[in-house]
A protein has these predicted regions:
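Post-Walker A helix-loop "phosphate-sensing" segment adjacent to the P-loop in P-loop NTPases
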Residues: 53-67
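Phosphate-binding/switch region of NTP-binding enzymes
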Residues: 19, 34-35, 40, 44-45, ...
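Conserved inter-motif catalytic segment of the P-loop NTP-binding fold
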Residues: 2-4, 10, 18-19, 24, ...
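Short, polar/flexible loop-turn hinges at active-site or ligand-entry regions and domain interfaces
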Residues: 61, 124, 204-206
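Pre-Walker A (Motif I) flank of P-loop NTPase domains
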Residues: 29-33, 68
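Hydrophobic positions on the alpha1 helix immediately C-terminal to the Walker A/P-loop
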Residues: 46, 50
Length: 228
């Protein structure tokens, strides 16, 4: 049996620790992030725009960004569709933004593929995974959706934390909602342990609520922010 690794309060209080590196000031840091919303409402457009802005170090929602290499795994799209979107969004594609259109499954090849990518492109600081459903074991998810959501994203979070990067997961929310207007499944299962969480809903006010441990952006800047 492995012994619990404990640290006393005084040691922790004075221990020099690195703070999370922000990619979008006050909104997005390294670790795991989730963009959740109904299908066909423009999540992939938003992700591509974020890729372009952050890879060039340009502002997002009026907030400063940290320039870094970006990988976008656009698993639900083909090359021509992403090309078309990019041509509408920019005239100068950044060289430090890279795309992938297929990858292995979670718990099988994906983690190794991400680590190999980080070895090949060590300045990568952000990886978008669009969408979670394309890389997970759907058979296992049907057995216990809550537990599978937690397992899948906890593994990705550890991978992001170990390498000091941000893995940004795009997820289609389910149509059913609970009594507090939250989508069932991943949003409920991971609201607390996996920051930050950005839900986007169809047919409602154009607001993107942000929730996460490291989010401190002023809500007057156009986002609803709450630290957990």
């Amino acid at each position: 049996m492995n012994k619990l690794q404990l640290i006393d309060a005084d040691t922790l209080y004075y221990k020099p620790l690195a703070h999370p590196k922000m990619l979008i000031d006050g909104v997005l840091s390294d670790g795991l992030a989730i963009l959740a919303g109904d299908s066909k409402i423009g999540k992939s457009w938003m992700v591509l725009w974020l890729c372009l802005q952050i890879s060039r170090g340009e502002a997002v929602w009026g907030l400063p960004t940290r320039k870094t290499d970006v990988v976008y795994l656009a698993l639900e799209d083909r090359e021509w569709r992403v090309q078309q979107r990019m041509q509408e969004l920019t005239d100068s594609p950044p060289e430090n933004l890279r795309f992938g259109f297929s990858c292995g499954q979670l718990g099988a090849e994906l983690e190794g593929q991400i680590e190999e990518t980080l070895r090949e492109f060590p300045t990568t600081g952000l990886i978008f995974l669009d969408t979670l459903q394309m890389v997970r074991d759907n058979a296992s998810a049907k057995v216990n959706a809550y537990a599978q959501d937690y397992k899948d994203l906890s593994g990705l979070k550890k991978l992001a934390d170990d390498h000091g990067i941000c893995i940004f997961v795009v997820h289609h929310t389910r149509k059913e909602r609970d009594s507090s207007n939250n989508e069932h499944g991943i949003c409920v299962a991971l609201r607390h342990p996996i920051p930050p969480y950005l839900p986007i809903r169809k047919g409602r006010a154009p607001v993107t609520p942000l929730k996460g441990c490291d989010i401190y952006a002023d809500s007057n800047r156009g986002n609803q922010c709450a630290g957990l």
